[in-house]
Amino acid sequence: MTKNTALTIFMVVLVIEMVMEETQGDTCHEYLYPEKCENNQCNSECATKFKEVGVFGFCVPPRSEPTEQFCICSYNC
């Protein structure tokens, strides 16, 4: 019984470590839709929302309507 418990705990720890390695170092993106997108405003909104170092945001026009823009926040996962 002790072997099974020890093996189960080892496997759970191994799986958790593998999941953490997969997400470390990746860049995630989230979209914000302000009424009027400006790069400085977008960048500050992203920094406020995620409260991390290395977060940045920029405005991008969507494919369908080039007059409206949205903000892309990029941050470390």
Swiss-Prot record:
Main location group: secreted
Transmembrane segments: none
InterPro entries membership: DEFL
Disulfide topology: 28-77, 37-59, 42-71, 46-73
Gene Ontology BP terms: defense response to fungus; killing of cells of another organism
Pfam families: SLR1-BP
Signal sequence bounds: 1-25
Entry superkingdom: Eukaryota
Keyword vocabulary terms for this entry: Antimicrobial, Disulfide bond, Fungicide, Plant defense, Secreted, Signal
Subcellular location: Secreted
One term under GO cellular component: extracellular region
PANTHER family: DEFENSIN-LIKE PROTEIN 122-RELATED, DEFENSIN-LIKE PROTEIN 184-RELATED
Family: Belongs to the DEFL family.
Name of the protein described by the UniProt record: Putative defensin-like protein 129
Organism: Arabidopsis thaliana (Mouse-ear cress)
